[in-house]
Amino acid sequence: QGRPLGPPIPP
């Protein structure tokens, strides 16, 4: 998909 894998970035 277009989104890279990895932990989500906190706001």
Swiss-Prot record:
Location in the cell reads:
Secreted
The Gene Ontology CC terms held by the record are: extracellular region
Is Secreted one of the keywords UniProt gives this record?
yes
Keyword Ribosomal protein found: no
GO MF term set: peptidase inhibitor activity; toxin activity
Keywords of this entry: Hypotensive agent, Metalloenzyme inhibitor, Metalloprotease inhibitor, Protease inhibitor, Pyrrolidone carboxylic acid, Secreted, Toxin
What does the function comment of this entry state? Answer: This peptide both inhibits the activity of the angiotensin-converting enzyme (ACE) and enhances the action of bradykinin by inhibiting the peptidases that inactivate it. It acts as an indirect hypotensive agent.
UniProt name for this protein: Bradykinin-potentiating peptide TmF
Organism per entry: Protobothrops mucrosquamatus
